[in-house]
Amino acid sequence: VHDVFITSRYVIPGYYYMLEGSPTSASNLEWMVTEFFQAEKKLAEADGKSVYDVCNEIVASTGPKDSGLIFLPFLYGCNVSLDGKACFIGLDGWQKRGHVLRAIYEGVVFAHKWHMDKLLKHRDMPDSIRLTGGAARSVEWVQIFADVFQVPVRIPAGTELGALGAAMCAGVATGEFDSYEAAADAMVSFARTQEPN
């Protein structure tokens, strides 16, 4: 398969995986917080909260059809074009930070959709998708994923899921589990599932 980023053999004999990726994810929100939300970060920390919780509240209070603002999430590069740059399209003076934050959340989701569309040329859409990482900690962001992909989004329990995968492989290698499927059945659980609107 030549039109996806990485293809390789999978740990289960006879299976292969395809991977798409680019630096277009939660680092975009991190940039926004670092550059423009330092006062909110200090206030949130004083209240025992995360500044990302504040961002989620702001996004939740901003409707998806409130502004039409578009964000291209290429702050750290773009695998679509070497010259691809991040930008806001449709930014007007009346828009507030909620519009900008929601545009960042949506821009990241649509970048993931671009990757998923490439992968779906080679298989059917799954009944659900699993999401991990920074965006998975945000109910608001996960809801945007569910709404854009129009399938349930399942969030695995835990935070260090790469280490969990390594532990499952070790469990199979040492004979603790008979198969990767058995290891996954025993070790993977889900914190929540969000349905599309």
For each predicted feature, which ranges?
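Glycine/Thr-rich phosphate-binding loops that ligate phosphate moieties of nucleotide
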Residues: 2-197
